[in-house]
């Protein structure tokens, strides 16, 4: 346990811990609470003509599930490298989740999922379907968070290299495609998620996020030292 703690402390520097913990906690709150508030509400289906021509490709569950790895790696890696990017990314993420949660509650959406066959990838899709009901669709947080991974990488392209930043974009585009190919979202959800994340990223540059998280870090450090 001591070695594990030391490894985590090395991977996640002190300045990144409060922002990342805050992001993780708020994600759970803003994603899981809205369905409890809208259980009996009318849910709209935002499917359009484009969605009718999009096939069900269960193989893309690899990229859909891979998004979770992208988020975890990118948020920790980018935050560890730059305090400024860390706090801006956290602020953009929080803005995204707050606005998305408002949509989930005020404009609940749903969609029709396909019947699954017995293949391996269908089985994996079925696991996602079991744990993730067809709600909280617009805007797509899957697409929004992957876009923030790219935007934060692009902001550090001089430090990380252009190839890394464009690699983030390429993987994010595969994540976008996966959301409709595995029928977790409809096309409009992608557009909404990307626009929301981009606006949140732009807005975060005008917020004193570094100072705010710095104060929170000081408060937690003070409380810890007083124990």
Which residues make up each language-model segment?
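Interfacial helix-loop-helix junctions of multi-pass membrane proteins
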Residues: 114-118, 134-138, 174-202
């Amino acid at each position: 346990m001591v070695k594990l703690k030391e490894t985590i402390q090395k991977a996640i520097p002190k300045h990144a811990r409060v922002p990342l913990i805050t992001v993780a906690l708020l994600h759970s709150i803003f994603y899981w609470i809205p369905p409890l508030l809208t259980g009996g509400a009318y849910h709209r289906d935002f499917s359009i003509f484009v969605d009718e021509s999009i096939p069900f490709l269960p193989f893309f569950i690899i990229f859909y599930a891979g998004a979770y790895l992208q988020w975890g790696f990118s948020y920790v890696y980018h935050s560890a490298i730059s305090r400024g990017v860390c706090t801006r990314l956290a602020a953009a993420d929080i803005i995204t989740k707050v606005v998305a949660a408002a949509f989930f509650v005020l404009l609940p959406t749903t969609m029709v999922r396909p019947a699954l066959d017995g293949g391996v990838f269908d089985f994996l899709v079925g696991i996602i379907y079991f744990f993730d009901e067809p709600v909280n669709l617009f805007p797509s947080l899957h697409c929004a968070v992957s876009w923030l991974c790219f935007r934060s990488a692009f902001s550090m392209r001089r430090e990380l290299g252009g190839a890394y930043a464009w690699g983030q974009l390429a993987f994010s585009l595969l994540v976008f495609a996966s959301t409709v190919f595995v029928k977790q979202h409809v096309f409009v959800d992608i557009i909404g998620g990307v626009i929301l994340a981009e606006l949140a990223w732009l807005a975060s540059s005008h917020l004193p996020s570094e100072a705010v998280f710095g104060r929170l870090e000081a408060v937690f450090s003070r409380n810890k030292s007083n124990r």
